[in-house]
Amino acid sequence: FLGDAPTGVLLGGPRAVRSDEWGTLTPLCFRQQYNTLGAYNRYSQTIGLVRTDNMLVYGQPAWDILTLFRPFYWGYLFFGSERGLSWFWCARLLVLFLSWFELGMLISDGQKKLSVMLGICVSWAPFIQWWFAINGLVEMLIYGAFFVLGTNYLVSHAFNPRKIAVAVGMAVCAVGYVLTFYPTWMVPVAWGFVPLFLWVVIWKFDRKVLRRVDVVPWLLIFVITAAGLTVLALTSWDVIKAELNSVYPGNAPSSSGGTGLWWMMKYPISLVSRFSMNELIVENSSIICFAPAGFILALWVIIKEKKKDPLLILLLGINLFLAWYYCVGIPKWLAKMLLLSFVNSNRGPQVLGFLRLTLFVRAVALKEKAPKRWLAALAAVISSAVPMRLALGFTKYEPGGLRYEYFDTAEKFVVVWAILAVVFYLLYRARKSKYTMAVLGVCTVVLASSIWINPVAKGVPEITKSETMQQIRDLVKEDPQAIWLVVDM
């Protein structure tokens, strides 16, 4: 961070490329403890002399009623910056895995192995790990998953005191989702949860146990959510208008049509990113979703096994619609009506890997028959060639024309293709309650592609114990009213 103290890293290595984490978000959160307007004040002029609102853009911990809807910032308020940073990282990873494990239990009808696989595929996806602390993506996935799970509980259980607690939690999720305030990811992530929400509300609704009193939790959700959003609008309206009228992300170029297919199917790049550490690997990371295996498995279940499963059909439908939107396009008026006009050509396809994961988990959970070995092998080789071809042709250009090739040798290409073909084969041969090898293969590929990304560190000695920081402390003691000008740091 400052370069003159131990980093405290126990495993892995610091990621200088993630400057919007260590150079922006973390310093902004740490400054709150030393806010000149009061520790963890909602407003600050500690960095810069202009009084700024800390709630939305790069939202920071603050003693404010809206922080009730940001539980992952509570560690800063109660334990200070160093332990607060640990709470922020560790709690989010743990809760992300648990929320998607529980969502997997719902999607797979209680099959634990598939649920563990889904939790690992989401929480340890390379794309999630590279963007773990920035722009609220992890929170979006957590809040969306818990909202679906909460809805399932409310529509399938008789009224009891737990429903009130669930309703409060769902309201926290709803307002917390809005507080992430990054439209170019908020919109596609929300659309990814739509089929799950519809399935729960329509097909899991149990009229036998529900009574009029069961409307109370929904009213509570509405009241708390409305109150939270009203407070946000009244106190941050200028920030909201400025964000929505910004060049990015407020007015991001629409992704209707264009290069969506490349962004949706380039996940093989993440399997070799360990050996290609250029500054664009973060932008080009993916959720390893093993597409198009999910589509093929879904069609097998629907056509070959003649199962008209509502959730599988909903997931397949929204996948195809969003693929059409990104690759072909829809009219501008429809894109605006569906809020998809906020989504640009790379951010949207990047996050929808989790939607394709839910598709293939549901398909494997329902699949009872397996194709013959030779047919599964042939299908695996051919279908895995699709993402490999797209990844091979995916090239990122900078304004200066600098070109990056991720599969710069034939060996890399062949090895990754072979790995994907094996996993695809295991998925095609998998069937209900007989998919252990497929689960192990999927988890191994995902973890090998991502577990090295974020280092494990103890404390933040590079900030708190560096010579530079000690000199700054001494100077501040000499002249607490000094105005600082920092150059080339």
Enumerate the predicted regions with their spans.
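Periplasmic/ER-lumenal interhelical loops and adjacent helix-loop junctions
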Residues: 230-311, 346, 350
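Membrane-helix boundary/interfacial segments in multi-pass membrane proteins
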Residues: 83, 87, 127-139, 320-375, ...
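Transmembrane helical bundles and short interhelical boundary loops of multi-pass, membrane-embedded
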Residues: 372-488
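Membrane-embedded helix bundles of polyisoprenyl
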Residues: 97-106, 112-205, 214-237, 383-390, ...
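Membrane-interfacial entry segments at the cytosolic side of transmembrane helices
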Residues: 161-165, 205-223, 307-311, 369-378, ...
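Soluble catalytic regions of membrane-associated enzymes that act on cell-envelope
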Residues: 21-63, 70-73, 79, 435-489
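Transmembrane alpha-helical segments
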Residues: 96-104, 144-155, 194-199, 203, ...
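Aromatic-rich transmembrane-lumenal/periplasmic boundary elements in polytopic membrane proteins
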Residues: 1-53, 213-271, 483-485
